[in-house]
Amino acid sequence: MTLSSVSAYANVHTRVRGMIGNLLSDETIARLSACPDLGTLIAKLDETSYASCLAASEETIKSSRRAAYEIRKKLTRDYKIIIEHAPSFARQLLVQLFRLYEVDNLKAVLRGIEVGEDWEKIRYTLFPVEDYPTLPFADMVQSGTVESAIALLHNTDYEVDLKPALTRYHDEESLFPVEVAIDLNYWQRLWDQIDTLPKQDQKITR
């Protein structure tokens, strides 16, 4: 890596080092594991870097799924900080890395539709992307079928690859070809973003 590249990443490196310092220690995780109930666990987390994510509301205290959803918001906010402080030529790659959570959400939504779950049951199993543009997941669930949900992905990066996958979905009566198409789409777009980096950065990234 050249001196100019090192300088370009200095700011984001400092931010990441600070985030590493906020990670829970093994000892803290062991203490949290010993908590007798969710309310006690949340109270203990109030002493950690997750405090801002877990206001002691009824929703988080009563539901471990909701508590986990709120905790995951911290990762979204940390990603945002990293992206904002990264060199401009690397930001779209970092955004694409973050979109792996969108991929997981998309597959979870399609699985939920397949088994007939409603939006209220699905929504807090998803990764919270907060301010980042994402797919119309609530509308997809409300559409009622996998086919109609995929139709709502018109004019998105997924459309071209999901059309042939939908044919296989009907033929095989399985979501597997759809999920494979989603994964391949993601990794191809990630590879394309790597190709936009400076040559030396491409070598390191690969």
Question: Where does each model-flagged region fall?
Answer:
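N-terminal domain-start signal
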Residues: 1-206
